Swiss-Prot record:
Binding positions for phosphoenolpyruvate per the UniProt entry: 22-23
Residue(s) carrying 2-(S-cysteinyl)pyruvic acid O-phosphothioketal: 116
Pfam families to which the protein is assigned, alphabetical: EPSP_synthase
Protein name: UDP-N-acetylglucosamine 1-carboxyvinyltransferase
InterPro entries hit by this protein: Enolpyruvate_Tfrase_dom (IPR001986), Enolpyruvate_Tfrase_sf (IPR036968), MurA_subfamily (IPR050068), RNA3'P_cycl/enolpyr_Trfase_a/b (IPR013792), UDP_GlcNAc_COvinyl_MurA (IPR005750)
GO CC field: cytoplasm
Domain of life: Bacteria
Annotated catalysed reactions: phosphoenolpyruvate + UDP-N-acetyl-alpha-D-glucosamine = UDP-N-acetyl-3-O-(1-carboxyvinyl)-alpha-D-glucosamine + phosphate
Family of this protein: Belongs to the EPSP synthase family. MurA subfamily.
Compartment(s): Cytoplasm
Catalytic-site annotation from UniProt: 116
Gene Ontology BP, a term: cell wall organization
Protein backbone atom coordinates (compact mmCIF):
# COMPACT_ATOMS: atom_id res chain seq x y z
CA UNK A 1 0.00 0.00 0.00
CA UNK A 2 1.17 3.52 -0.73
CA UNK A 3 1.80 6.12 1.93
CA UNK A 4 2.32 9.88 1.90
CA UNK A 5 5.22 11.53 3.69
CA UNK A 6 5.08 15.15 4.77
CA UNK A 7 7.63 17.48 6.30
CA UNK A 8 5.62 20.27 7.86
CA UNK A 9 6.17 23.82 8.98
CA UNK A 10 6.01 25.51 5.58
CA UNK A 11 3.37 28.11 4.73
CA UNK A 12 1.41 27.48 1.55
CA UNK A 13 1.31 29.91 -1.35
CA UNK A 14 0.34 29.81 -5.00
CA UNK A 15 -2.60 28.55 -7.00
CA UNK A 16 -4.33 25.19 -7.50
CA UNK A 17 -7.36 24.07 -9.49
CA UNK A 18 -10.23 22.07 -8.01
CA UNK A 19 -11.30 18.86 -9.76
CA UNK A 20 -14.77 17.67 -10.67
CA UNK A 21 -17.02 16.55 -7.83
CA UNK A 22 -16.80 12.87 -7.04
CA UNK A 23 -20.14 12.94 -5.23
CA UNK A 24 -21.78 14.39 -8.34
CA UNK A 25 -20.03 12.10 -10.82
CA UNK A 26 -21.00 8.84 -9.07
CA UNK A 27 -24.82 9.18 -9.28
CA UNK A 28 -24.54 10.60 -12.81
CA UNK A 29 -22.54 7.53 -13.85
CA UNK A 30 -25.31 5.39 -12.37
CA UNK A 31 -27.87 7.43 -14.32
CA UNK A 32 -26.34 6.20 -17.59
CA UNK A 33 -28.13 2.90 -16.86
CA UNK A 34 -31.43 4.67 -17.57
CA UNK A 35 -30.85 4.95 -21.34
CA UNK A 36 -29.30 3.35 -24.39
CA UNK A 37 -26.84 5.21 -26.56
CA UNK A 38 -23.57 6.81 -25.52
CA UNK A 39 -23.38 9.33 -22.70
CA UNK A 40 -20.36 11.59 -22.20
CA UNK A 41 -19.26 12.89 -18.80
CA UNK A 42 -16.72 15.73 -18.70
CA UNK A 43 -14.63 17.09 -15.82
CA UNK A 44 -14.55 13.66 -14.14
CA UNK A 45 -11.79 13.29 -11.52
CA UNK A 46 -9.25 10.45 -11.67
CA UNK A 47 -10.25 8.69 -8.46
CA UNK A 48 -10.53 5.16 -7.13
CA UNK A 49 -14.29 5.52 -6.63
CA UNK A 50 -14.70 6.48 -10.30
CA UNK A 51 -12.73 3.36 -11.28
CA UNK A 52 -14.90 1.23 -8.98
CA UNK A 53 -18.14 2.60 -10.43
CA UNK A 54 -16.83 2.15 -13.98
CA UNK A 55 -15.96 -1.48 -13.19
CA UNK A 56 -19.44 -2.00 -11.76
CA UNK A 57 -21.08 -0.56 -14.89
CA UNK A 58 -18.96 -2.87 -17.05
CA UNK A 59 -20.04 -5.85 -14.94
CA UNK A 60 -23.66 -4.79 -15.46
CA UNK A 61 -23.09 -4.89 -19.22
CA UNK A 62 -22.22 -1.32 -20.18
CA UNK A 63 -19.34 -0.25 -22.39
CA UNK A 64 -17.23 2.21 -20.39
CA UNK A 65 -14.19 4.16 -21.59
CA UNK A 66 -12.39 6.06 -18.85
CA UNK A 67 -9.82 8.71 -19.69
CA UNK A 68 -10.39 11.36 -17.02
CA UNK A 69 -11.52 14.08 -17.28
CA UNK A 70 -13.63 12.29 -19.95
CA UNK A 71 -15.73 9.16 -19.38
CA UNK A 72 -17.92 7.58 -22.07
CA UNK A 73 -20.66 5.11 -21.20
CA UNK A 74 -22.52 3.24 -23.92
CA UNK A 75 -25.01 0.40 -24.08
CA UNK A 76 -23.55 -3.09 -24.13
CA UNK A 77 -24.89 -6.31 -25.61
CA UNK A 78 -25.99 -8.12 -22.47
CA UNK A 79 -27.51 -6.54 -19.39
CA UNK A 80 -26.86 -8.24 -16.09
CA UNK A 81 -28.90 -6.44 -13.38
CA UNK A 82 -26.84 -7.79 -10.50
CA UNK A 83 -24.22 -5.83 -8.52
CA UNK A 84 -21.97 -8.31 -6.67
CA UNK A 85 -20.49 -7.99 -3.21
CA UNK A 86 -16.92 -7.97 -4.59
CA UNK A 87 -17.58 -4.58 -6.22
CA UNK A 88 -20.21 -3.02 -3.96
CA UNK A 89 -18.19 -3.67 -0.79
CA UNK A 90 -15.57 -1.19 -1.99
CA UNK A 91 -17.94 1.79 -2.03
CA UNK A 92 -21.34 2.33 -0.47
CA UNK A 93 -22.44 4.64 -3.30
CA UNK A 94 -22.68 1.51 -5.46
CA UNK A 95 -26.18 1.03 -4.03
CA UNK A 96 -27.27 3.84 -6.36
CA UNK A 97 -27.45 1.38 -9.26
CA UNK A 98 -30.50 -0.14 -7.52
CA UNK A 99 -33.02 2.50 -8.60
CA UNK A 100 -31.90 2.75 -12.26
CA UNK A 101 -31.69 -1.05 -12.71
CA UNK A 102 -35.11 -1.62 -11.19
CA UNK A 103 -36.77 1.18 -13.17
CA UNK A 104 -35.18 0.17 -16.48
CA UNK A 105 -35.20 -3.62 -16.34
CA UNK A 106 -37.84 -4.49 -13.75
CA UNK A 107 -35.46 -6.32 -11.46
CA UNK A 108 -32.23 -5.76 -9.57
CA UNK A 109 -30.03 -7.72 -7.20
CA UNK A 110 -27.58 -5.46 -5.39
CA UNK A 111 -25.27 -6.35 -2.53
CA UNK A 112 -25.63 -4.35 0.65
CA UNK A 113 -23.01 -1.58 0.47
CA UNK A 114 -19.53 -1.00 1.90
CA UNK A 115 -17.17 1.99 1.68
CA UNK A 116 -15.95 4.16 4.56
CA UNK A 117 -16.58 2.56 7.93
CA UNK A 118 -18.19 5.56 9.62
CA UNK A 119 -21.32 4.17 11.15
CA UNK A 120 -24.10 1.98 9.85
CA UNK A 121 -25.39 4.42 7.19
CA UNK A 122 -28.46 2.25 6.49
CA UNK A 123 -30.26 1.98 3.15
CA UNK A 124 -33.73 1.60 4.66
CA UNK A 125 -34.87 4.94 3.21
CA UNK A 126 -33.96 3.77 -0.31
CA UNK A 127 -36.00 0.58 0.11
CA UNK A 128 -38.97 2.33 1.69
CA UNK A 129 -39.11 4.76 -1.23
CA UNK A 130 -38.84 2.09 -3.92
CA UNK A 131 -41.61 0.09 -2.25
CA UNK A 132 -43.80 3.20 -2.34
CA UNK A 133 -43.22 3.30 -6.11
CA UNK A 134 -44.48 -0.27 -6.42
CA UNK A 135 -41.39 -2.45 -6.03
CA UNK A 136 -41.35 -5.75 -4.18
CA UNK A 137 -38.17 -5.97 -2.11
CA UNK A 138 -36.60 -8.65 0.03
CA UNK A 139 -33.20 -9.14 1.63
CA UNK A 140 -31.50 -12.43 0.85
CA UNK A 141 -28.03 -13.49 2.02
CA UNK A 142 -26.58 -9.98 2.02
CA UNK A 143 -28.32 -8.85 -1.17
CA UNK A 144 -31.21 -6.50 -1.90
CA UNK A 145 -33.51 -8.28 -4.36
CA UNK A 146 -36.05 -5.96 -5.99
CA UNK A 147 -38.68 -6.60 -8.65
CA UNK A 148 -41.47 -4.62 -10.28
CA UNK A 149 -43.54 -4.27 -13.41
CA UNK A 150 -43.39 -0.56 -14.19
CA UNK A 151 -42.80 1.73 -11.24
CA UNK A 152 -45.60 4.20 -10.58
CA UNK A 153 -45.28 7.72 -9.27
CA UNK A 154 -46.11 8.29 -5.61
CA UNK A 155 -45.35 10.57 -2.69
CA UNK A 156 -42.33 9.50 -0.66
CA UNK A 157 -41.53 11.18 2.66
CA UNK A 158 -38.00 10.49 3.89
CA UNK A 159 -37.66 10.03 7.65
CA UNK A 160 -34.47 12.08 7.44
CA UNK A 161 -32.59 13.75 4.59
CA UNK A 162 -30.41 11.23 2.74
CA UNK A 163 -28.25 12.18 -0.22
CA UNK A 164 -27.90 8.77 -1.85
CA UNK A 165 -31.50 7.90 -0.98
CA UNK A 166 -32.77 11.07 -2.63
CA UNK A 167 -30.64 10.40 -5.71
CA UNK A 168 -31.67 6.74 -5.98
CA UNK A 169 -35.36 7.66 -5.85
CA UNK A 170 -34.91 10.51 -8.35
CA UNK A 171 -33.39 8.10 -10.88
CA UNK A 172 -36.06 5.45 -10.31
CA UNK A 173 -38.84 8.04 -10.62
CA UNK A 174 -37.41 9.33 -13.91
CA UNK A 175 -38.76 6.18 -15.62
CA UNK A 176 -41.84 5.71 -13.42
CA UNK A 177 -45.33 6.25 -14.79
CA UNK A 178 -46.73 9.56 -13.61
CA UNK A 179 -45.59 12.07 -11.04
CA UNK A 180 -43.42 11.37 -8.00
CA UNK A 181 -43.04 13.80 -5.12
CA UNK A 182 -40.10 13.36 -2.75
CA UNK A 183 -40.42 15.14 0.61
CA UNK A 184 -37.69 15.93 3.17
CA UNK A 185 -35.02 15.53 0.50
CA UNK A 186 -31.31 16.17 0.81
CA UNK A 187 -30.52 19.65 -0.52
CA UNK A 188 -26.87 19.14 -1.48
CA UNK A 189 -25.56 20.69 -4.72
CA UNK A 190 -24.83 17.19 -6.03
CA UNK A 191 -28.56 16.37 -5.83
CA UNK A 192 -29.31 19.52 -7.82
CA UNK A 193 -26.70 18.46 -10.37
CA UNK A 194 -28.35 15.06 -10.84
CA UNK A 195 -31.64 16.85 -11.44
CA UNK A 196 -30.03 18.84 -14.26
CA UNK A 197 -28.80 15.63 -15.89
CA UNK A 198 -32.16 13.86 -15.60
CA UNK A 199 -33.79 16.88 -17.27
CA UNK A 200 -31.28 16.61 -20.11
CA UNK A 201 -32.28 12.95 -20.46
CA UNK A 202 -35.97 13.82 -20.85
CA UNK A 203 -37.43 13.53 -17.37
CA UNK A 204 -39.04 16.61 -15.86
CA UNK A 205 -37.46 17.33 -12.49
CA UNK A 206 -38.24 20.42 -10.44
CA UNK A 207 -37.21 21.42 -6.93
CA UNK A 208 -33.84 19.63 -6.85
CA UNK A 209 -31.76 21.47 -4.27
CA UNK A 210 -34.84 22.06 -2.07
CA UNK A 211 -36.52 19.73 0.40
CA UNK A 212 -39.36 18.84 -2.01
CA UNK A 213 -38.59 17.42 -5.46
CA UNK A 214 -41.14 16.64 -8.18
CA UNK A 215 -40.34 14.19 -10.98
CA UNK A 216 -42.51 13.54 -14.02
CA UNK A 217 -41.38 10.19 -15.37
CA UNK A 218 -40.74 9.49 -19.05
CA UNK A 219 -41.40 6.36 -21.12
CA UNK A 220 -37.76 6.37 -22.16
CA UNK A 221 -34.73 8.55 -21.57
CA UNK A 222 -31.94 9.81 -23.82
CA UNK A 223 -28.15 9.74 -23.35
CA UNK A 224 -26.47 12.99 -22.36
CA UNK A 225 -23.33 15.11 -22.56
CA UNK A 226 -22.57 16.86 -19.27
CA UNK A 227 -19.67 18.58 -17.46
CA UNK A 228 -19.52 17.74 -13.75
CA UNK A 229 -19.55 20.58 -11.20
CA UNK A 230 -16.50 21.33 -9.05
CA UNK A 231 -15.87 19.38 -5.86
CA UNK A 232 -16.90 21.59 -2.95
CA UNK A 233 -15.39 19.24 -0.35
CA UNK A 234 -12.02 19.18 -2.11
CA UNK A 235 -12.17 22.98 -2.27
CA UNK A 236 -13.08 23.19 1.42
CA UNK A 237 -10.23 20.85 2.31
CA UNK A 238 -7.67 23.10 0.60
CA UNK A 239 -9.23 26.17 2.20
CA UNK A 240 -8.67 24.60 5.62
CA UNK A 241 -5.17 23.43 4.66
CA UNK A 242 -4.24 26.98 3.63
CA UNK A 243 -5.69 28.38 6.85
CA UNK A 244 -3.86 25.82 8.99
CA UNK A 245 -0.45 26.09 7.33
CA UNK A 246 -0.71 29.85 6.89
CA UNK A 247 0.21 31.80 3.79
CA UNK A 248 -1.77 33.01 0.80
CA UNK A 249 -3.50 30.57 -1.57
CA UNK A 250 -5.70 30.98 -4.65
CA UNK A 251 -8.13 28.12 -5.28
CA UNK A 252 -9.43 28.06 -8.84
CA UNK A 253 -12.83 26.57 -9.68
CA UNK A 254 -13.90 26.56 -6.02
CA UNK A 255 -17.70 26.85 -5.58
CA UNK A 256 -17.69 29.34 -2.71
CA UNK A 257 -21.49 29.69 -2.93
CA UNK A 258 -21.73 26.05 -1.79
CA UNK A 259 -19.17 26.52 1.00
CA UNK A 260 -20.59 29.48 2.90
CA UNK A 261 -20.88 27.50 6.15
CA UNK A 262 -17.19 26.56 5.96
CA UNK A 263 -16.10 30.04 4.89
CA UNK A 264 -18.06 31.60 7.77
CA UNK A 265 -16.32 29.40 10.34
CA UNK A 266 -12.91 30.15 8.82
CA UNK A 267 -13.60 33.87 9.07
CA UNK A 268 -14.70 33.46 12.70
CA UNK A 269 -11.39 31.71 13.33
CA UNK A 270 -9.47 34.71 11.96
CA UNK A 271 -8.84 33.60 8.37
CA UNK A 272 -9.39 35.85 5.35
CA UNK A 273 -11.64 34.20 2.75
CA UNK A 274 -12.99 35.94 -0.33
CA UNK A 275 -13.46 35.98 -4.08
CA UNK A 276 -10.66 37.14 -6.33
CA UNK A 277 -11.56 36.83 -10.00
CA UNK A 278 -12.46 33.22 -10.71
CA UNK A 279 -10.66 32.04 -7.57
CA UNK A 280 -11.25 31.85 -3.85
CA UNK A 281 -8.43 33.47 -1.91
CA UNK A 282 -7.54 32.13 1.54
CA UNK A 283 -4.98 34.07 3.54
CA UNK A 284 -3.61 33.82 7.06
CA UNK A 285 -0.21 35.39 7.49
CA UNK A 286 1.01 35.76 11.05
CA UNK A 287 -2.40 36.01 12.70
CA UNK A 288 -3.31 33.60 15.52
CA UNK A 289 -6.34 31.35 15.13
CA UNK A 290 -9.39 31.69 17.36
CA UNK A 291 -11.27 28.67 18.70
CA UNK A 292 -14.78 28.32 17.25
CA UNK A 293 -17.51 25.74 17.75
CA UNK A 294 -18.88 23.65 14.87
CA UNK A 295 -21.97 21.47 14.55
CA UNK A 296 -22.33 19.41 11.39
CA UNK A 297 -25.66 19.58 9.58
CA UNK A 298 -27.21 18.72 6.21
CA UNK A 299 -26.57 21.25 3.44
CA UNK A 300 -26.52 24.25 3.63
CA UNK A 301 -25.12 23.66 7.13
CA UNK A 302 -21.53 22.75 7.99
CA UNK A 303 -20.73 19.55 6.04
CA UNK A 304 -19.90 16.38 7.93
CA UNK A 305 -17.29 15.76 5.21
CA UNK A 306 -15.36 18.83 6.49
CA UNK A 307 -15.49 17.97 10.19
CA UNK A 308 -12.18 16.07 10.44
CA UNK A 309 -10.24 18.71 8.50
CA UNK A 310 -11.63 21.56 10.61
CA UNK A 311 -10.74 19.68 13.79
CA UNK A 312 -7.06 19.88 12.81
CA UNK A 313 -7.41 23.64 12.40
CA UNK A 314 -8.91 23.89 15.88
CA UNK A 315 -5.94 21.97 17.29
CA UNK A 316 -3.88 25.06 16.38
CA UNK A 317 -6.30 27.64 17.80
CA UNK A 318 -5.98 29.24 21.21
CA UNK A 319 -8.64 27.92 23.57
CA UNK A 320 -11.13 25.07 23.50
CA UNK A 321 -13.55 24.42 20.67
CA UNK A 322 -16.51 22.07 20.58
CA UNK A 323 -17.23 19.96 17.49
CA UNK A 324 -20.57 18.16 17.37
CA UNK A 325 -21.17 15.44 14.76
CA UNK A 326 -24.89 15.06 14.05
CA UNK A 327 -24.87 13.18 10.73
CA UNK A 328 -22.90 9.97 11.22
CA UNK A 329 -21.97 7.91 14.24
CA UNK A 330 -18.39 6.78 14.74
CA UNK A 331 -16.90 9.68 12.77
CA UNK A 332 -14.14 10.58 15.22
CA UNK A 333 -11.78 7.76 14.25
CA UNK A 334 -9.12 10.31 13.31
CA UNK A 335 -8.90 11.52 16.92
CA UNK A 336 -6.53 8.77 18.21
CA UNK A 337 -4.24 9.37 15.23
CA UNK A 338 -4.18 13.13 15.87
CA UNK A 339 -3.39 12.35 19.52
CA UNK A 340 -0.28 10.50 18.31
CA UNK A 341 0.83 13.84 16.87
CA UNK A 342 0.24 15.70 20.13
CA UNK A 343 -3.38 16.85 19.81
CA UNK A 344 -5.46 17.19 22.99
CA UNK A 345 -9.01 16.09 22.16
CA UNK A 346 -11.68 14.64 24.45
CA UNK A 347 -14.57 12.75 22.86
CA UNK A 348 -17.91 12.34 24.59
CA UNK A 349 -20.40 10.58 22.34
CA UNK A 350 -21.07 12.78 19.33
CA UNK A 351 -19.07 15.72 20.74
CA UNK A 352 -15.34 16.38 20.61
CA UNK A 353 -13.71 19.04 22.79
CA UNK A 354 -10.53 20.25 21.12
CA UNK A 355 -8.03 21.90 23.46
CA UNK A 356 -5.93 23.90 21.05
CA UNK A 357 -2.65 25.73 21.17
CA UNK A 358 -0.18 22.87 21.60
CA UNK A 359 2.13 22.26 18.62
CA UNK A 360 1.72 19.06 16.60
CA UNK A 361 4.70 16.82 15.87
CA UNK A 362 5.33 14.43 13.01
CA UNK A 363 4.40 10.78 13.50
CA UNK A 364 3.37 7.69 11.58
CA UNK A 365 -0.43 7.65 11.45
CA UNK A 366 -3.06 5.48 9.80
CA UNK A 367 -5.96 6.68 7.67
CA UNK A 368 -9.30 5.10 8.62
CA UNK A 369 -11.61 6.73 6.07
CA UNK A 370 -11.60 9.27 3.25
CA UNK A 371 -11.95 12.55 5.14
CA UNK A 372 -9.90 11.34 8.12
CA UNK A 373 -7.02 10.72 5.72
CA UNK A 374 -7.23 14.32 4.48
CA UNK A 375 -7.18 15.58 8.07
CA UNK A 376 -4.00 13.64 8.79
CA UNK A 377 -2.31 15.12 5.73
CA UNK A 378 -3.23 18.62 6.95
CA UNK A 379 -1.88 17.74 10.40
CA UNK A 380 1.37 16.71 8.75
CA UNK A 381 1.56 20.08 6.98
CA UNK A 382 1.49 21.93 10.30
CA UNK A 383 3.66 19.57 12.36
CA UNK A 384 6.53 21.69 13.65
CA UNK A 385 9.08 18.91 13.96
CA UNK A 386 9.73 15.52 12.46
CA UNK A 387 8.22 13.77 9.47
CA UNK A 388 4.64 12.55 9.17
CA UNK A 389 3.82 9.39 7.27
CA UNK A 390 0.16 8.71 6.50
CA UNK A 391 -0.51 5.02 5.88
CA UNK A 392 -3.41 3.44 3.96
CA UNK A 393 -3.83 6.38 1.64
CA UNK A 394 -6.02 4.28 -0.62
CA UNK A 395 -8.75 5.96 1.43
CA UNK A 396 -7.43 9.35 0.26
CA UNK A 397 -7.33 8.17 -3.35
CA UNK A 398 -11.06 7.47 -3.21
CA UNK A 399 -11.85 11.18 -3.07
CA UNK A 400 -8.83 13.43 -3.73
CA UNK A 401 -7.19 13.69 -7.13
CA UNK A 402 -3.39 13.91 -6.79
CA UNK A 403 -3.53 15.59 -3.37
CA UNK A 404 0.19 15.31 -2.68
CA UNK A 405 0.97 16.91 -6.06
CA UNK A 406 -1.45 19.80 -5.55
CA UNK A 407 0.01 20.52 -2.12
CA UNK A 408 3.52 20.40 -3.58
CA UNK A 409 2.38 23.05 -6.11
CA UNK A 410 1.70 25.27 -3.09
CA UNK A 411 5.15 24.71 -1.62
CA UNK A 412 4.45 21.81 0.73
CA UNK A 413 7.11 19.12 1.20
CA UNK A 414 4.94 16.11 0.32
CA UNK A 415 5.69 12.89 -1.51
CA UNK A 416 3.98 9.60 -2.24
CA UNK A 417 5.88 6.46 -1.26
CA UNK A 418 4.76 3.45 -3.26
CA UNK A 419 4.30 0.02 -1.76
CA UNK A 420 4.49 0.89 1.95
CA UNK A 421 2.73 -1.73 4.06
CA UNK A 422 0.17 -0.51 6.56
Amino acid sequence: MDSIRIRGGKPLSGKIRISGAKNAALPILCATLLSDGESLLRNVPALRDIETTSALLRFLGRNVETAPPLVKVGAGDNVRPEAPYELVKQMRASVMVLGPLLARFGRAKVSLPGGCQIGTRPVDQHLKGLEALGATIRLSRGYIVAECKRLRGAEVVFDLPTVTGTENLMMAAALAKGRTTLVNCAREPEVEELGRVLNKMGARVSGAGTDVIHIEGADELEPFDHAIISDRIEAGTYMVAAAAAGGDVLIENAPLEDLEAVAAKLRQAGVEVGREGDCVRVRREGRPLRAVDVTTAPHPGFPTDMQAQFMVLMCLAQGTSRIVETIFENRFMHVPELARMGAHIDVDGHTAHVHGGAPLSGATVMATDLRASASLVIAGLVATEGETEVLRVYHLDRGYEFMERKLAQLGADTARVEGRDG
